[in-house]
Amino acid sequence: MHAYRTHTCGALRASDTGASVRVSGWIHRKRDHGGLVFIDLRDHYGLTQLVLHPETPGFDVVERLRAESVIKIDGEVVARDAAAVNPNLPTGEIEIRVSAVEVLSEAAELPLPVFGEPDYPEEIRLKHRYLDLRRETLHKNIVLRSRVIQSIRSRMFAQGFNEFQTPILTASSPEGARDFLVPSRLHPGKFYALPQAPQQFKQLLMVSGFDRYFQIAPCFRDEDLRADRSLEFYQLDVEMSFVTQEDVFAAIEPVMHGVFEEFSAGKPVSPIDGVHTFTNDFGATLEHRGFERLTYAQSMAWYGSDKPDLRNPIKMQDVSEHFRDGGFGLFAKILGADPKNRVWAIPAPTGGSRAFCDRMNSWAQGEGQPGLGYAFFSKDQNGWGGPIAKNLGEGFQPIADQLGLTHDDAVFFVAGDPAVFAKFAGLARTRVGTELKLVDEEQFKFCWIVDFPMFEWNEDEKKVDFSHNPFSMPQGGLEALETQDPLTIRAYQYDIVCNGYELCSGAIRNHKPEIMLKAFEVAGYGAEVVEEQFGGMLNAFRYGAPPHGGLAPGIDRIVMLLAEQVAIREVIAFPLNQQGQDLLMNAPAEAQDRQYKELYIRSAPPIKV
């Protein structure tokens, strides 16, 4: 017989009745019933009920053991009485009548209970993560993560991709966040950087003659934390040679759709076999297969976000023309003050009551806004009520017609420069959808966001800057960079969004040195700066670079959505807290004087004033 087990705690069934077995595991729960002791023994695979009689050797020892002590038992599998069968357990038809027991490890008093999974402060959970990970929900999340990564790998290999590893110790590069620096002992005063992404290396692999690359890549970014962001994370890093944007979409859509369909527990996933029509920012209507597509401009105008939750059916509309000639003086004044200003409407299906409108108005004020203009259908007056409808009178009906409002609806308005209010309008749309229970939470709704602006205005530095990935190919190439207003140039950049979360970003790369240098020049970087920071890749492009592109879905966010969690810490085995601390290993920690000397550095903590 094996030293510790013949079966796992999730393996035994009614067909095993009469068998002599050995199992080992943790005491999940212990109950004393009139002299008999019942134990739910747990391991990675499940639970099995044990029965100990007073005459069982070791009975007295087991009686005093705490929960989470580890034991090994020998015994006979017996059928439970019909009244004691637990249909919720795979092992619920049997129990083990214990004949011998050995304590393998005795547990001290627990700082964090495992059974029952009560809510506990995150600080305690992270400090005792080894106990937290024994809890069923978190344990399943980590197993799910493993299975998702395995599924992704299989799907990538099936499409002809090769998995390569890229360096962890590399050079610093401006990727949009601060680097984690690693001092070099062999080169005093110099530092490595941990990769924010394997961006340059995966492009260099394409220049090196490889074609379809992927890896499950660790990435490190010293940035402010939030529920869906961590200082260290993993991404499915992908790059392909001789591809267009459409080729990249066609390669990754089956992977994303397949993984979500495999692990969605029956929830519908956006199909990829249907045909969609898509109108770009220049008015061209195109047909395509796969996930729905929105341009960045459309996404901001309709949803107030570049990562819209399309489970929410509300689509905002521009209703500026209804207010230009007066009727509601405040909006007319705002529109007349600047040609960029607009009035957006946020329909609220079934929200037609003053109480709901007042509640939304109070919420807006809590968000630091003066309030929300609104109108609603008043059943008492059998007509449209609210200050805006009252001022417009019959002039409100064309707005209702444009928005498709019915006699159960309301509508909210925001006015000003969309660049300023779009984010708040998006929050208001989300709030309306949530309050009115319009969001179908039992589905995974995907879309592509395409045609991102190549550049944006940096108000702090009063200059044009890259809006996203600086290595993207501008639409129109060198001619666009030389002749167009930089703020009108689109890039071949794209994101995948699911249920309001950005799951990945990607781009067709700028593989021509002259276009790359010009793009950086537009953003205020001289050729010498580009050569210094990106010389390795730039020089490689001078020796023949294929057109290439890629993207990088975030593993943590994918698993977070599939596990129905709201924080990625719930799908990471040993995460940092929101202050970037590892409470289990006590990191970050001060280094020893010897280590500072070996690295030729000194620590100068900030002076508190």
UniProtKB/Swiss-Prot annotation:
It holds the Pfam family tRNA_anti-codon. Its main location: cytoplasm. GO terms for biological process: aspartyl-tRNA aminoacylation. GO terms for cellular component: cytoplasm. It is an enzyme of class 6 (ligase). HAMAP family: Asp_tRNA_synth_type1. This is Aspartate--tRNA(Asp/Asn) ligase. It comes from Caulobacter sp. (strain K31). The lineage of its organism: Bacteria, Pseudomonadati, Pseudomonadota, Alphaproteobacteria, Caulobacterales.
